[in-house]
Amino acid sequence: MDQGGGILELHKDLKMPHTMIMPDFGMSGIAHLDGEHIVVSVPEAVMVSDVVTDEEGIMLETALEAEVVEEPDICQEDVITTEGVIMSESILGAEVAIQEALSGTADLIEETVPDQVFVAELMSPHIQSPLDHNLVSAEVMVTDADTVIDSHDTLQSDVTIKADDDVEDVKSTSEDYLMISLDEVGGKLDIEDTSLKISADVGQDDDGSKEDEFSSEVIKVYIFKADGDEDVEIGSTEVVEESDFPGRHTVMESVGSGRLPREKMVYMAVKDANQEDDLNCSEMTDQVYMEVIVGEEEAPAITEAQMEDSPVNKTIVPAAWATAYGSSLESKNGAATPYLQITDSISTSRALKQKIKKRRRGETRQCQTAVIIGPDGQPLTVYPCHICGKKFKSRGFLKRHMKNHPDHMFKKKYQCTDCEFTTNKKVSFHNHLESHKLIIKNEKIPEYTEYTRRYHEASPLSSNKLILRDKEPKLHKCKYCEYETAEQGLLNRHLLAVHSKNFAHVCVECAKGFRHPSELKKHMRTHTGEKPFHCQHCEFSCADQSNLKTHIKSKHGTDLPFKCGHCPQAFADDKELQRHAEIFQGHKTHQCPHCEHKSTNSSDLKRHIISVHTKDFPHKCDVCEKGFHRPSELKKHSETHKGNKVHQCRHCDFKTLDPFTLSRHILSVHTKDLPFKCKRCKRGFRHQNELKKHMKTHSGRKVYQCQYCEYNTTDASGFKRHVISIHTKDYPHRCDYCKKGFRRPSEKNQHIMRHHKETLL
C-alpha cells in the first residue's frame, strides 16, 4: 500500500459499512475485524480529508502511513444504516460526535462541515426530530466501551469518541489540553439559550450540478508531530479549492514517524466568503481547530527566516503558532495570558457576534479564537517566551526553555560607559555611577551621554523623552565626613550605615542621627509640623524653645516691661527677671553643705543633695521595691507595672515583673549556693557581673580599686570619672554664661547647647 495515503472504496452493493479509525498504540500491522466493521489502523500523525471525489469512493489520506485491511466475506444486513467512525478519547481529550446526513442520492456521501461541538444534553431535543436529508447537524455522544449503537432507533451517521481500556496507561503518563475554536461563519442554529452558527453544503443532484444556496467548504483534519531534535517544516498545509474536488487531494507535508510528540494538532479550517461582511471579520480567518500541547521535551525556537522559506499558509495557522511564524496576532509582552477570555457566564452567541474594532495602522490585531481546557476543566494559563514567542503550560518549562537563549539570560541591563561594570540592579548601577562622580565632581557633565540614553531606556519608570543635563547636579554632603552624593536617599543610607553607631537616636524619616532623645524629639517636629511654643505678645509659634527666645529678644525686646540692667535682655515676668539677675550676678543664697554647689532656691538644692550626695532612695516601688529619689520618678516608674503580671517570691514579700529577676533574688537571698564559680581560684559569686569583675584580677591587666568604695575597673579614665563624680565636691568646669559647674567638659558643652544656644547665634 502507498506510504503517502490509502484509498478505501465502497462498493455499490454494500449499503453502509462501518469505518473505524483508531490510533496506533503499538498495534501497527494488525487489523481488527469485528463483524460488519472495517478497522483501519492509523498512527497519531494523520490527516483525514473527507472530501467529495466521485460518486463511488471516499479518499483516506495519511501523513505518515496507514494500513487498510478489507475482509472479503463481510456480511451486510439491511437493518444497519449507521456509519460510525470510532476514535480513541486519548487523541482529542474530549468526546465528540460528528453527525452527517446523506443526500437524496444514496450512492454519494456528501461533504459535511461540523462547525460547533455540543454537549449531549444540549442536543437531546434535536435527536428526537425526524431526519431531513438536507440538514447537517452535529452531536456529542458519550459512550463507554460496551455501548451498543442501536441502528433501529436512529438513522443518523455518528462519529463517536470511544473510551478504550487499552490506552489507559498512555493517558495517565501525559497531560493533554484541548483547545476548541468557535467558528463565526455559517447559518444559525438555536440550542436552548445559545445561538450558534453552522455552515454546510447541500447535496448534489444526479447530474452533478451544485446548488448556490451555500458556498463551497473544505474539511481538513490534521494531526501534527514535531521533534525537538530536527529542523522540520511543521504546519505545512494546502487549501483545497473547488477545482480540486474531482481529483485526488494532496497529502500534507509532515514529519517522519517514530518521534516523540511535542505538539499534536487537530486542525479544521472552514472558509465562507459570502458571510464575512456580515460579521465585520473579512480580514480574519475562520478557524475550527483543536490543539494539544505536551511538555515532555523542548522544541527549538522557529525563527522568522525559517518561516519565510516554509510554504505555510499563514491565513490558517493556529493562534498558538502565530508568534513563532512572525505573525502579529499576539503581543510579545512576556506575560502569562490565557488563550480565551470566554467564561461560562458569557453566552457563546454573544462571543461569536463581537465586532472587531478597526485599529490604527501598526497595531496588533487580537481575536478571541480559542480556549484551552486543562485536566480540571478550567481555562489554562500559558507562559510565553518573550524572545521567540513559544508558549508553555508552567513556569518550570519556560525556565528550562530560556536556556536556549543564553545571550539574553546573561546579558546585563545596565552598562557603565566609563568602565566594564555591568549589573541588573538599578540601585547598584546608580551607586557605581556615584563613585565616578566623586572622582570627577569638578568636571562638567556633558549634555548627552551614552549613559543617559541607556539608563533611561532600561528603566521601566523612565519617560520616552531623553533628559539633557547642562549643569552639574546638586551634591548632598555629609556633615560628619567627606562623603558627597547627588541623591538625598543615598546620603540617608550612608548616615545609617556609617554614623548610626555614634548617634544612637536616628530619625526614621531622614536618617539624621542624634546623641540624645530630646534632640530627636525636637527634630521630629520639623517633619510633623508641630509648633508647641507660642509667643505671648503675638501669634508667632515655633517648634524650638530657643527659637522662641530669639524671637522675643529680636521682636519684643523693647516692649517687655522687665528689663535687665546688666544686659539687653527683657522679661515679661518679674520672677524671671529676678532669677536671671541672681544667676547673672552670681548671688546664690542656697549653698550645698557637701560641696560648693549653690542654688537659687531650696527645691533645687534639695534635688542636688538627693541625686548627688545621698545613696538613699526613700521612695520605694511596691511591686519591685526599686527606690527613687523623688516621688515623680516613682510615679513614672509605676506606669510600667500596669497591665503586667507580678511575680511573688515564695519566701518573702519580694515582687517583680521579670521572672529572671525573681530567680536571681531567690538565688542571692534565699539560698547559700554560689552558682557562678571562678575557674582559676574556685571562688563563688551570686551574680555574673561579680564574677566578671573578679576575672579581671586574673587577666594580668592593672585594676584600679576605689579607696572610698568597692568600685574597681581596668580603665584609668573611667576610674578618674568615678572619683570625680562620686567622691569629690569639685566642679572644675564652669559655664561661661550662668557659672554653673560640671565635672566633665562634655557636660558643660551639652548644657551650653541646650540652654544658651541663642547666645551663640
Curated annotation (Swiss-Prot):
InterPro entries, sorted: Transcrp_activ_Zfx/Zfy-dom, Znf_C2H2_sf, Znf_C2H2_type
Tissue/organ expression: Present in ovary and brain but not in other tissues (at protein level).
Subcellular location: Nucleus; Cytoplasm
Zinc finger (C2H2-type): 383-408, 414-436, 476-499, 505-527, 533-556, 562-584, 590-613, 619-641, 647-670, 676-698, 704-727, 733-755
Lineage of the organism: Eukaryota, Metazoa, Chordata, Craniata, Vertebrata
Primary location: nucleus
Keywords: Cytoplasm, DNA-binding, Metal-binding, Nucleus, Repeat, Transcription, Transcription regulation, Zinc, Zinc-finger
Note on domains (UniProt): The sixth zinc finger contains a Phe residue, Phe-584, instead of the final His residue normally found in C2H2-type zinc fingers. There is another His residue a few residues downstream, His-587, but this is not involved in coordinating zinc. Despite the His to Phe substitution, the zinc finger retains the ability to bind zinc using a tridentate metal-binding site of Cys-564, Cys-567 and His-580. The zinc finger also has hydrolytic activity against 4-nitrophenyl acetate.
MF GO annotations: DNA-binding transcription factor activity, RNA polymerase II-specific; RNA polymerase II transcription regulatory region sequence-specific DNA binding; sequence-specific DNA binding; zinc ion binding
Annotated binding of Zn(2+), by residue: C564, C567, H580
Gene Ontology terms: cellular component: cytoplasm; nucleus; vitelline envelope
BP terms from Gene Ontology: positive regulation of DNA-templated transcription; regulation of transcription by RNA polymerase II
Protein purpose: Transcription regulator required for brain development. Probably acts as a transcription factor that binds to the promoter of target genes, leading to activate their expression.
Family: Belongs to the krueppel C2H2-type zinc-finger protein family.
Protein origin, superkingdom: Eukaryota
PANTHER family: C2H2-TYPE DOMAIN-CONTAINING PROTEIN, ZINC FINGER PROTEIN
Positions of transmembrane segments: none
Gene: znf711
One Pfam family, short name: Zfx_Zfy_act
Cysteine disulfide links: none
Keyword Transport: no
Protein name: Zinc finger protein 711
SMART domains recorded: ZnF_C2H2
